Amino acid sequence: MKKVVSLAIVISGLVFPAVAQKAVQSKNKSLTLLTQWMDLQSRLVRNSSGIPHVAYSRHFCYTAIAVYESIVHGEDEYRSLAGQLIRLDQLPSPPKDEMCWSAGLNAAYAAMLRYFYASFSSCVASIDSMEKSQEQLQSRYSNETVIKSREYGKQIAATIIDWSKTDGSDNAMSYNPQQGEGLWIPTPPSYTPASTPYWGGNRSLTKDLLTEENLLRQPAYSTDPNSDFYKMANEVFTVSEHLTPEQKATAFYWDDSPNGSYKTVYGHWTSLLSGLVKQHDLPLIKAAEAFAKMTMSMYEAAILAWDGKYKYNVVRPVTYIQQHINNQWMPVIVTPPHPEFPAAHATLSNAAATALCSLFGDTCSVTDDSYIDIGLKERSYASLQDVAKEAGLSRLYGGIHYRYSIAQGAKLGERAAKHVDENVTFHASRK
């Protein structure tokens, strides 16, 4: 895809293509509408037990796409994603007369979350309450315009939901793990069976995604103390035995397990992005673009990571260390129930950081307060890449990944985001 260099504006360290905005409503109120929904979605995962961690990639990605599509036709210099993403051929067109775009966004976001969390009554109650509270933004419009705009948002959400149902994620198939030396087996303490083994076969958003997995180089298994594999496993053991308080805190900060306390890695990055959007007071359309681009990159990265995990079936550190180094050893955080390589947190976080760097720049500092509500102190970073680096290393400190897998995952996540950037455009001026 050819890239056209266009005029850009720099706002508080952010680099975005210039936009001729339509003065439809207060930018700050509209932005607050979006960030409050993003913050709510990040919290809802705590009350949606039983959903596999990787499955939240769908929730955040499809919701972000619906949000973007619910307002994109209110901006002349932005374009729809219809026709750019696999099997998303067409979306409803907005009415030609006056629109209340905030009403459409509000309805679309609410509809998406109701779909994903319909079986959790506390989540539905929170969604209903949020939707109702945001209706004050619509008071300056006629009742007819508001109703019409809400219906449009619901139509967008319904179309995205129908599209999401065909991505293959609901295909239930039995799975028998490969057996052999060096291959993954269920891990202590719960020895949970393999989770989402066919996720790598889900439909991607963009064409030729799996060609990016050619970057991966599987570590050669060996039990020889002089081998690279033994050395990288021994590093996990040694690091865990000499963790500094800061390293241990980092392991817990990026645990992100869907266990009722954390927001998952997807909610964590969405919370971080919400803070960035508020910090820089972005126009609504730019915030929606950032949300969509980040979550789309993470969605694609998850497919790549899970395809690699179940292709190579690399043994987890806890299994190797207990068998060959110290049979009493346990990691700092609980090992997720899927193969080790590549490291998912590194893959997903580098996808998110790369996507956001393409919009915010490589030197955008950020403060992450995602978990202050559970007693974890906020963290400040000089750049988004520093955030991703720490997220990856947290899995070494936690004892659940080898450094090699973290490095390989980081490269894969970066390529996933660049693949999205090369195949999808949000701007009418870019062809």
Residue ranges and their predicted role:
Residues 21-431:
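Acidic/polar surface patches and capping/hinge elements
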Residues 1-25:
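Bacterial Sec-dependent N-terminal signal peptides
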